[in-house]
A protein has these predicted regions:
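Alpha-helical recognition segments enriched in aromatics with Gly/Pro capping
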Residues: 26-84, 98-99, 233, 237-249, ...
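Glycine-rich phosphate/pyrophosphate-binding loops
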Residues: 110-125, 365-381, 767-769
Length: 880
């Protein structure tokens, strides 16, 4: 009997010697079911200090200390899109996640990152989609009869049914079954009046017909320009989507079509190194078993348990691969012999095209060299794509460390199912941006760990929108406190200073907690929790202590420092714009960043002495940069709002006529604006205000960095306070009791409310009264808060319409119904980034690192499992 001793050694049993090689290969595979030892990169002492930054590394399934090869310089490659269709929120989740980490490395930890992104513009999916688009267009031009269309749909149904037999993914299988049911139902559906039945069928069964046509005529396609046209179109769409999401462009953007010669040379070298072979068709395959049996190498480093998973391997090969010519089912294509109807390039092995996996290896290696600091992509790419990348690259270079840190973003699910094009359950980025801003979408992702599975739902959206509202409200208050402090400074010798409780120490403590959270694998969720705590502390210890007739310069300092710190962090995360206040670093003094320690004397939040000149700069505390268009519009529309107000009150008696005339005179004197004759030229109103107050012109201010915020906004803010002062005067008169006519009072109160709630809102201006009727009757001079706030936010802030509430209820019911579709046994199976082992019921038993789950964790999961059983039972009952 041949006895295996480990590491390829056997007892020498003669009668089993012929099988030694086979058994050796088998047992080697069994040995390699756990991840190999990972060696921490060695830091060069000459490169200076580095932060104790840990990143969750898929090569070890743990958080590892991040040490780049070259000091501060980080070499990073990210798998880009295969450009055959529009991008969806699953893509957004991945690219926003890595955009945030990249920003943190550069703007917080002071690393220099070379970020390379590829465009996969040669792929089976692109080939098939381009051919189908071409064939379906020709099909419609030929004006097929009804019998032909019905017959082609029937063929499409049969093709889907044949796919179902071999499909192992439960979600895809469920989708394919539902698609068969839909198409069968479609064939018996009568279109609406006057709608052509042929066009109706083609429109609603386009994919099925296109698949039928491709099977029959795809090989006849000779115009290879269609592949280029499709790829360039969707590449452009992708780049526009990324810009819409505020994602920083890559340092280097590479395309597969630009690397054909380099790919051929790369493949040839792998063949020369003995790890690939040429098949009779002219395709070149990677010899997985040869690689796995090499003492230097290890196949499937990321997902060792997937070695031999032919279903996943086949999915990585694409739909158009040649079957039956590999030495082993584990082997994968480096170069594919092109068949009729496919693009091709000449190579030593005949006409062909690159395999999917080799493309990334060649492009990354060409730009970044033989070892990458970071490689990243979605968790669904772990195996086979990324494991195959690692294998072929290490076979090319002859070493075992092509990537030091592999980062994988978690799945984005919708109703518990992975969002994907194959399941037709995706939401495009552009559709998402129709209902939510790019800032809100980014906040959705920041409120969750970048590597965890997260569900896109009504609740996650509400959390992000709610947090954005908190930020806007907080910064609005901080800004107004600066203006109040400016007012109090004019009487600072006569006013008592509000007691200070050393809020700065609280701020410093939060700064260090944020630093620790970002060192913990860029834990943005904890950082946002810190921001929430800080805002709550500021509310109770700063905002609540603002009192009339008190000098609040120290409180204003604390409010400004807090707002600035939050804005600096959010700027780094890509949430806040690069305003004057948001500039600078939020890293605490004494902390380590790439290159050394932040000096102890360094003020991470530099505070100036509270004086009147400082508050103009401090007053623009906002997530948004200030634009010329926004200033022009707000000034002009606020003038229109004021004109409506004075027209409403001027005829309410001599008292109010005198108030209006006095007010109009002061506005004319201070700002050169005639309230009874507001100019139609919107820009001219603002230019007039700037000229009258001896300020630089609008065009001159826009040429100065942050000139609109520092020079123009303080003038506009003073103007807005002047403009609303007439409303304050009217409210004081009403509170004095001097107006006895109840109808007159009603009209005046309505005019005041309209000014605040309708006309100023339409101007994008938020006016918040702080003085109550009692305060006004006592003669207390309590200035209202005012500022520019997005009109959509103001409208939604006043009230949620009944229609909106109904829509929300419908969405929740829809999500609940869709969630019930998943059997409880499959509820956790897609969460491979959280769990590594499951029992026969589908319940997780071990976490992603292979450790057994605690009793408390199992108890929580059991509750979720039982709840899903009930939802699934309800779902099944609804289908009866």
């Amino acid at each position: 009997m041949l006895c295996y001793l480990g590491r390829g050694h056997f007892f020498n049993t003669p009668n089993l010697r012929p099988y030694q090689s086979l058994l050796l290969s088998y047992y080697r595979k069994m040995e390699k079911r756990t991840q190999p030892k990972w060696f921490t990169p060695v830091q060069n002492a000459q490169d200076g200090q580095l932060p104790n930054l840990y990143l969750y590394n898929s090569l070890t399934s743990r958080k590892d200390l991040f040490i780049p090869q070259d000091g501060r310089h980080v070499k990073w490659y990210t798998c880009g899109p295969t450009v055959y269709d529009v991008s969806h929120l699953g893509h957004a989740r991945t690219y926003v996640a890595f955009d945030v980490i990249r920003r943190v490395l550069v703007d917080y930890f002071n690393f220099k990152v070379t970020y390379v992104l590829n465009i996969t513009d040669i792929d089976d999916k692109i080939i098939k989609r381009a051919r189908q688009n071409h064939l379906i267009s020709d099909y419609q031009l030929k004006d097929p009869d009804l019998a032909t269309v019905v017959g082609d749909i029937a063929k499409g149904i049969q093709k889907i049914k044949s796919k179902i037999q071999f499909e192992t993914d439960s979600d895809k299988k469920a989708y394919l079954n539902s698609e068969v049911d839909r198409l069968i139902s479609l064939l018996s559906t009568v279109p609406l009046d006057e709608e052509d039945p042929i066009n109706y069928l083609i429109l609603n069964a386009r994919d099925a017909i296109a698949d039928t046509l491709d099977s029959a005529y795809g090989a006849s396609i000779s115009d290879h320009q269609i592949f280029e046209v499709l790829a360039r179109h969707f590449e452009k769409e992708y780049l526009v989507d990324m810009e819409s999401l505020n994602i920083i462009p890559p340092s280097v953007l590479v395309r597969v079509t630009e690397y054909i010669d380099a790919i051929i040379k790369y493949v040839k070298q792998i063949i020369d190194n003995g790890f690939a072979y040429v098949a009779p068709s002219g395709s070149v395959y990677f010899d997985t078993n040869r690689f796995a049996s090499s003492p230097m190498h290890f196949y499937a480093k990321l997902v060792p348990t997937a070695y031999g998973d032919t279903n996943q391997l086949e999915s990585g090969e694409g739909e158009l691969c040649i079957t039956g010519e590999k030495k082993s089912p584990n082997d994968f294509a480096l170069w594919k012999a092109s068949k009729p109807g496919e693009p091709f390039w000449s190579s030593p092995w005949g006409k062909g095209r690159p395999g999917w996996h080799i493309e990334c290896s060649v492009m990354a290696s060409d730009i970044l060299g033989g070892t990458l600091d970071i490689h990243s992509g979605g968790v669904d790419l772990k195996f086979p794509h990324h494991d195959n990348e690692l294998a072929q690259s290490e076979a090319y270079f002859g070493h075992s460390h092509w990537v030091n840190y592999f980062l994988h973003s978690g799945h984005l699910t919708i109703s518990g199912c992975k969002m994907s094009k194959s399941l037709k359950n995706f939401i495009t980025i552009r559709d998402a941006l129709k209902t939510h801003s790019s800032r809100q979408i980014r906040l959705i992702f920041l409120l969750h760990s970048w590597r965890d599975t997260m569900d896109y739902s009504v609740d996650t959206l509400a959390e992000a929108v709610g947090f954005e509202k908190q930020l806007i409200d907080f910064l609005y208050t901080c800004s107004n406190i600066q203006f109040l402090a400016k007012q109090s400074l004019s009487n600072k010798h006569d006013l008592e200073e509000t007691e200070n409780d050393d809020f700065q120490q609280t701020l410093v403590d939060i700064q260090h907690k944020v630093y620790d959270a970002l060192c913990d694998s860029c834990d943005t969720r904890s950082v946002l929790d810190c921001i929430k705590v800080l805002m709550s502390e500021a509310d109770s210890r700063i905002f609540s202590r603002i009192e009339p007739n008190k000098c609040i310069s120290k409180l204003a300092d604390d409010a400004f420092a807090t707002g600035r710190f939050i804005l600096q962090l959010l700027r780094i995360f890509g949430v806040a714009d690069h305003t004057a206040v948001a500039a600078g670093s939020p890293v605490p003094s004494g902390a380590i960043i790439a290159g050394g320690k932040v000096p102890e004397h360094h003020e991470s939040i530099p505070l100036r002495e509270a004086d009147e000149s400082a508050f103009g700069f401090r007053s623009w505390l906002s997530l948004d940069t200030l634009t010329e268009e926004r200033l022009i519009s707000s000034v002009h529309k606020s003038l229109e709002a004021c004109s409506i107000f004075i027209q409403a009150i001027i005829h309410e008696g001599d008292t109010f006529k005198e108030i209006v005339n006095t007010f109009a005179y002061e506005v004319q004197k201070q700002y050169g604006i005639d309230l009874f004759n507001v100019q139609s030229d919107e820009r001219q109103s603002l230019e007039c205000i700037l000229k009258t107050t001896n300020q630089a012109s609008l065009s001159e201010s826009t040429c100065i960095p942050h000139g609109l915020e520092i020079n123009v906004w303080p003038v506009v803010l003073n103007f807005l306070h002047t403009l609303i002062s007439i409303r304050n005067t009217v409210r004081k008169v009403l509170s004095s009791g001097s107006i006895t006519d109840s109808l007159c009072k009603k009209r005046l109160y309505e005019a005041c409310d309209r000014f605040r709630d309708i006309d100023l809102v339409n101007a994008g201006i938020r006016l918040q009264d702080r003085a109550t009727a009692i305060d006004l009757s006592r003669g207390l001079d309590i200035s209202p808060f005012i500022g520019l706030v997005d009109k959509k936010f103001l409208i939604s802030g006043h009230s949620e319409s009944k229609t909106k509430r109904v829509e929300t209820k419908v969405i929740k019911e829809s999500v609940k119904q869709e969630t019930g579709r998943i059997p409880p046994s499959e509820l956790f199976l897609s969460e491979v980034d959280k769990y590594s082992k499951f029992d026969s019921k589908g319940m997780p038993t071990h976490d992603a690192s292979g450790n057994e789950l605690s009793k408390s964790a199992l108890k929580k999961l059991q509750k979720l499992y039982i709840a899903q059983e009930k939802r699934h039972a309800t779902f099944l009952k609804s289908k009866e």
